[in-house]
A protein has these predicted regions:
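N-terminal charged segments
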Residues: 1-66, 79, 142-144
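A conserved beta-strand-loop-helix scaffold within acyl/acetyltransferase catalytic domains
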Residues: 141-193
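Conserved acetyl-CoA-binding loop-helix of GNAT-fold acetyltransferases
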Residues: 52-60, 188-193, 197-210, 230, ...
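Conserved beta-hairpin
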Residues: 25-28, 76, 82-93, 159-173
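A conserved beta-turn-beta hairpin within the catalytic core of GNAT-like acetyltransferases
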Residues: 34-43, 95, 177-187, 196
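A short helix-loop-beta-strand connector motif used in the catalytic cores of GNAT acetyltransferases and
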Residues: 19-24, 67-68, 79, 95-98, ...
Length: 251
């Protein structure tokens, strides 16, 4: 895999031209691409050292006036170099660092083992299990997911999964199809504490890889935390870029 080429393709297709699912809108202003709705997330920008400070200040003021949280994700290859400093000056705080990881679907998807039952979410009942699994894994209420996905259970560009162990909810995960249909985007994968170290995270990644292959996608991508990175590397993912998500909380 030509990692530099694939990373440039990811930037162009996923970050600069994001697909807005129901409930989100893509807004472009001042050289910045922002998804707004049930969350607010800046995915891309074309700024210079002379324009970055004003653009950051403008977006910070806008979302503060609305009393809404704003996330701005910066990768190590992004420019201008001043952007992280400008975000800090405007009151953004860095979340835990992560790594963009990419898997070439031309490679073999590793088999998984373990007594885990992975089911695709097709009904409202299973969506409730999906939300519960996320809440158990991350210890936070995730009611936004119910709103975001209840009308998308038959969306061909979305696949939600719940993992069960002995009929008990253990984990959940999500696959989204990028706008140019080259990338499958992996989200979630959180496992409830009592079911960790059983290979469930790995099984959910493998299941989504198989689904992505069935849809003739080229790559999988995910923003991984340090705890997930070794598992993904073992499955064949390659580290593409370090990242930090800067968060502006309403005050």
């Amino acid at each position: 895999m030509d990692l530099a080429r694939v990373l440039a393709q990811y930037d162009a297709e996923v970050r600069a031209s994001p697909k807005a699912p129901p409930g989100l809108v893509v807004e472009r202003a001042d050289g910045v691409v922002c998804l707004t709705g049930y969350f607010n997330f800046i995915s891309w920008w074309e700024l210079t050292p002379s324009t970055v400070r004003q653009a950051v200040a403008s977006h910070a003021a806008h979302f503060r006036s609305r009393g809404e949280k704003l996330m701005w994700r910066v990768y190590e290859h992004d420019s201008p170099a001043e952007i992280s400093g400008c975000l800090a000056e405007e009151g953004f705080e860095p979340d835990a660092a992560g790594t963009l990881m990419i898997f070439d679907l031309a490679n073999e998807v590793l088999a998984t083992t373990g007594n885990v039952d992975i089911r695709r979410v097709k009904t409202e009942e299973h969506l409730e299990d999906f939300v519960k699994a996320s809440e158990q894994a991350f210890g936070e209420r995730d009611t936004w997911q119910r709103t975001a996905y209840s009308d998308r259970l038959n969306d061909p560009d979305l696949a939600l999964y719940v993992a069960y162990v002995s009929a008990e909810i253990a984990a959940s995960a999500r696959l989204e199809i990028g706008s140019a249909r080259s990338f499958g985007l992996l989200f979630g994968g959180g496992v409830a504490p009592s079911y960790r170290r059983l290979g469930i995270y790995r099984a959910l990644v493998a299941e989504r890889a198989r689904e992505a292959r069935r849809r003739d996608l080229l790559y999988l991508s995910t923003d991984a935390r340090e705890t997930s990175k070794p598992i993904l590397q073992n499955l064949g993912f390659v580290s593409a870029a370090k990242e930090v998500t800067w968060v502006l909380n309403p005050s």
